[in-house]
Amino acid sequence: MPDEGAAGPPSSAPAGGGAIDVVLATRNRARGAERAARAILAAAYPSSSLVVVDQSDDSTTREALREVASDPRVSVIAAPPRGLAAARNLGVASTAAPIVAFTDDDCAPAPGWLEAIAAAFAGDASIGVVFGSVVAADYDRGAGFTPAYRVDRPRTARTLARKPSVEGIGACMAIRRSTWRALGGFDEQLGAGSALRAGEDTDFAVRALLAGAGVRETPAASVTHYGFRAWDEGRATIEGYMIGLGAVHAKMLRLAGPAALRPIAALAWRWIARGPVVDLNHRPPRALRLAAFLRGAWTGWRAPLDRERGHFAAPRR
């Protein structure tokens, strides 16, 4: 993984703001990726880089991004479908700025997104991770739901015990490159496209706290989420969330020991009882969420773990 001064696309920001590059991972969402990329460029500093890591099955997404990619700030990298965490690691390795922001290919950042992220990092070199709000676009609440996460006020966690106060999700997330390097990047056995299906964002924040970095939430940074799920699809989505989070919590216990018990109890109960869906009439049954969480926790407890890096070991082929 590169040092902060490693070669890559140049990046600078207006006076008073830290240099920030953006990584967008995408797979088989040509229209969404184009919308996200255009919104990112509209919200980005003139000298920020945007790296799109495309794990699509064909060239449709790259063709949709052809006009966007004519902007000298944009690079599109075709990559094998190894999952979201791997895509984000590749994207970070392909940038140079000391801060890297992420959103998803079904999201669009609001104006001022990067300025808000820069402000959240400014003046405190101990902050390693920043999360913002993920606001659902308008949708038919009778037909399904769109996952969302609203930050109502600034919060900072500096210890594992405070992790339940800053949940955050990776659709509006930024990291300090030095933290990414220190942690060995995102755990590629977690997240969308992996066997454990989710949790790479939560896991990164947990490991950052264990390494002594702070995790901050800011309501000033936000993205709009267009990822509507019909109820049947939503059940599978939430099941995936629970499996990933179960694995993350099991890993937390293995890495931190008894110090992890309190935050595990708080976070697990919050997600199992509430989950990311606010419509009580259609929420997947608590038993389904609990079963998925426990399945993920059992897998995470038994999976080979590289304790030095804090990553699950890749399965043997």
Each language-model region and where it sits:
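Short, well-formed alpha-helical segments that are part of the catalytic scaffolds
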Residues: 28-42
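Glycine-rich, basic loop-to-helix element that forms the pyrophosphate-binding segment
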Residues: 36, 79-95
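A conserved acidic beta->alpha catalytic loop
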Residues: 39, 46, 54-63, 107
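Short aromatic/hydrophobic "clamp" motif used to bind/position activated sugar donors
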Residues: 100
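Conserved donor NDP-sugar-binding/catalytic core segment of glycosyltransferases
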Residues: 112-145
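Short, flexible, basic/aromatic active-site loop/helix in glycosyltransferases
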Residues: 132, 147-166
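Acidic donor-binding loop at a coil-to-helix junction in glycosyltransferase catalytic cores
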Residues: 168, 192-203
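Non-catalytic, C-terminal membrane-associated alpha-helical segments of glycosyltransferases
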Residues: 237-243, 254-317
